[in-house]
Amino acid sequence: MQKYISEARLLLALAIPVILAQIAQTAMGFVDTVMAGGYSATDMAAVAIGTSIWLPAILFGHGLLLALTPVIAQLNGSGRRERIAHQVRQGFWLAGFVSVLIMLVLWNAGYIIRSMENIDPALADKAVGYLRALLWGAPGYLFFQVARNQCEGLAKTKPGMVMGFIGLLVNIPVNYIFIYGHFGMPELSGVGCGVATAAVYWAMFLAMVSYIKRARSMRDIRNEKGTAKPDPAVMKRLIQLGLPIALALFFEVTLFAVVALLVSPLGIVDVAGHQIALNFSSLMFVLPMSLAAAVTIRVGYRLGQGSTLDAQTAARTGLMVGVCMATLTAIFTVSLREQIALLYNDNPEVVTLAAHLMLLAAVYQISDSIQVIGSGILRGYKDTRSIFYITFTAYWVLGLPSGYILALTDLVVEPMGPAGFWIGFIIGLTSAAIMMMLRMRFLQRLPSAIILQRASR
């Protein structure tokens, strides 16, 4: 029991800064929306539309680079720290290549925006302008993620938290300057949010690099001079590990976007209630997602040390802590769901629907916690392909079709509206949790030599 308590302390010490960093990042998006809304409702809508396209694109790159964390954790645990610098440099090359692709997609996103049904031309122009300003921040964001993944792979999660809050604090005045045109800058309205956020991402990257260069704990990693050339073998391995994670993230984000589109014809009350419940459950999701990042670090580190038993301990402890957290957040959600809904909207119909949907959200919080931590465990074992297959099957083969049938058809019961989609979420997330646990159990039953060989690739 003592080993599990000790492991839980280590996991929480790693996870809490990640939680706070994620809150800071979420708050940046909130600040952009609110400050654009302070200028005009059109600018607020433009930022919201632009963000809905930016997120899937940038999260694809973010997911691709998540492969660095278990690679660095495993090298750190095995005492091969001299190889970390080369992996990080290849991570920067990969981030640069992916940034170019993302920037091309975002530059041409105007075709998607202008094809939206009944969209106001002025709104479309502002959304395109916002994206074309924000896309210049894509390299800065992804370079920052490489540097952050380096730190987190070395079990240093506090720098990412600090840089996240620095970015948030800088974002507010820089937004103000570019939205309203102060200190000699042009008045860009909502487009100014894109300029400001792009600048902040570069500032966060430069601040993180400055920290890494000065950190004594990373002195031995900075032993390579000059800029390493692209190493096709290393980059290929990073892509093999990262692409399934990137696709899984992409399919998860697009799932919720598709459901939002399917709910939209049902009426204002249904859309508002669905959005409130989804926004709150997304906030609760930060906890298990951050714990999953910590579990990846611990599992990768233990496998690097050559201890499959300690890796199992880290995995099991992460699951136990995650289930405890999810139980508490589920109780909190059930107990205060009406009061929470009132914070968003005071329309009685909207509040009633949102409270009902939050009850369904509470049901899946334990499953959601297990599946996301299970994904973190599999990343630690470098078993990322299974994450993609499980996520795709659970969300798009099981969850979305069942939700559609329950919400919009009478094949099983009378159309349930938004609640049907939320039952679909429960089916999808529970299926993902079961499959993640089965895969983890399969991996952990393999001979230690095979597990360690797979982890060292």
UniProtKB/Swiss-Prot annotation:
Cytoplasmic side, ranges: 1-10, 74-92, 148-159, 213-242, 297-313, 371-386, 439-457
Q: Which UniProt keywords apply?
A: Antiport, Cell inner membrane, Cell membrane, Ion transport, Membrane, Sodium, Sodium transport, Transmembrane, Transmembrane helix, Transport
GO CC annotation terms, alphabetical: plasma membrane
Periplasmic-side stretches of the chain, per the record, are 32-52, 114-126, 181-191, 264-275, 335-349, 408-417
Which GO MF term does the entry hold, naming one?
Answer: xenobiotic transmembrane transporter activity
- Could you list the residue ranges that cross the membrane? 11-31, 53-73, 93-113, 127-147, 160-180, 192-212, 243-263, 276-296, 314-334, 350-370, 387-407, 418-438
Localization in the cell: Cell inner membrane
**Where is it predominantly found?**
membrane
Cited InterPro entries = MATE_fam, MATE_MdtK, MdtK-like, Multidrug-R_MdtK
The Gene Ontology biological process terms listed for this entry are: sodium ion transport; xenobiotic transmembrane transport
Q: Which residues form a coiled coil?
A: none
Q: Which superkingdom is the protein from?
A: Bacteria
Short name of any one Pfam family annotated for the protein: MatE
**How does the entry describe its membrane topology?**
Multi-pass membrane protein
Q: Which HAMAP family match?
A: MdtK
NCBIfam families for the chain: matE
- Give the family this protein belongs to, as stated in its UniProt record: Belongs to the multi antimicrobial extrusion (MATE) (TC 2.A.66.1) family. MdtK subfamily.
Q: What does it do?
A: Multidrug efflux pump that functions probably as a Na(+)/drug antiporter.
Name of the protein described by the UniProt record: Multidrug resistance protein MdtK
- The organism is Shigella dysenteriae serotype 1 (strain Sd197)
